[in-house]
């Protein structure tokens, strides 16, 4: 049950990932063989629930890449269910301050360190109580990544970084750019300056910085600055653009698409 993704971040080894939004175990397994270090199963903006997350975790399990799951909100009940089906690494969205970061950590820990309910006899995570001492080992293998996506969260970053149990901080460029007044333009110089400053600050604190960016040049720039988990594409975008390109080669006209962060 060792969390190799958490170990890689702790060792300072950059991890390259892909975002999964198709909500399909079939496509998740297909992409698990592509060679990425981690795959993000999105429960915030993709039509996922606990059952579809479970089937994708099962599909990815035979492969070396590590799944990361994003719940729809920083909700301890939802987090408990996601952990019980086997999630070890969580990306918690829209964390605004240290208190909210602390709540996210507590939701992943069994008492007395946290508030995670004990139901290991029913849980895939414990292999239905077949993992010896699961209740004693589970806390140490949980990896908590919190998402900062607003100016308020950026202002509170030093306090968020001080929260014990937060393994990494993920910068959400789409929401951050919107909050800064540049919706749809995460490459605006002011947004980029804020992102770069945050990456350096997070890395210097000893935590792992992360981001999603489909722009190859920017992805490499963030890695140079010290980002440790970088998602470089989204399955829905890859499929849509590849299909449009194929159709265009035979004269078809696709609906115009404005390039974005994804």
Curated annotation (Swiss-Prot):
Pathway: Aromatic compound metabolism; 4-hydroxyphenylacetate degradation; pyruvate and succinate semialdehyde from 4-hydroxyphenylacetate: step 7/7
GO CC annotation, single: cytoplasm
Broad EC category: lyase
Residues reported in the UniProt entry to bind a divalent metal cation: 149, 175
Residues marked Transition state stabilizer (site): 70
Positions annotated to bind substrate: 147, 174-175
Full protein name: 4-hydroxy-2-oxo-heptane-1,7-dioate aldolase
Source organism phylogeny: Bacteria, Pseudomonadati, Pseudomonadota, Gammaproteobacteria, Enterobacterales
């Amino acid at each position: 049950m060792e969390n190799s993704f958490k170990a890689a971040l702790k060792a300072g080894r950059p991890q390259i990932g892909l975002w999964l939004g198709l909500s399909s175990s079939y496509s998740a397994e297909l992409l698990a063989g592509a060679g990425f270090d981690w795959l993000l199963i999105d429960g915030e903006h993709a039509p996922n629930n606990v059952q579809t997350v479970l089937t994708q975790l099962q599909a990815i399990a035979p492969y070396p890449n590590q799944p990361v799951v994003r719940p729809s909100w920083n909700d301890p009940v939802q987090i408990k269910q996601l952990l019980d089906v086997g999630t070890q690494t969580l990306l918690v969205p829209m964390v605004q301050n240290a208190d909210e970061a602390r709540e996210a950590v507590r939701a992943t820990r069994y008492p007395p360190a946290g508030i995670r309910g004990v139901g290991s006899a029913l849980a895939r995570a414990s292999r239905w109580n077949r993992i010896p001492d699961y209740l004693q080992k589970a806390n140490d293998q949980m990896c908590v990544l919190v998402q900062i996506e607003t100016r308020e969260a950026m202002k509170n970053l030093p306090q968020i970084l001080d929260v014990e149990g937060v393994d990494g901080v993920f910068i959400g460029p789409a929401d951050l750019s919107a909050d800064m007044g540049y919706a749809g333009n995460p490459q605006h110089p002011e947004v980029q300056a804020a992102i770069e400053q945050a990456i350096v600050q997070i890395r210097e604190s000893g935590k792992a910085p992360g981001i999603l960016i489909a722009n190859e040049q920017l992805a490499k720039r963030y890695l140079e600055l010290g980002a440790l988990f970088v998602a470089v594409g989204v399955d829905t975008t890859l499929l849509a653009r590849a299909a449009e390109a194929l159709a265009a080669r035979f004269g078809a006209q696709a609906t115009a698409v404005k390039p974005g962060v994804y």
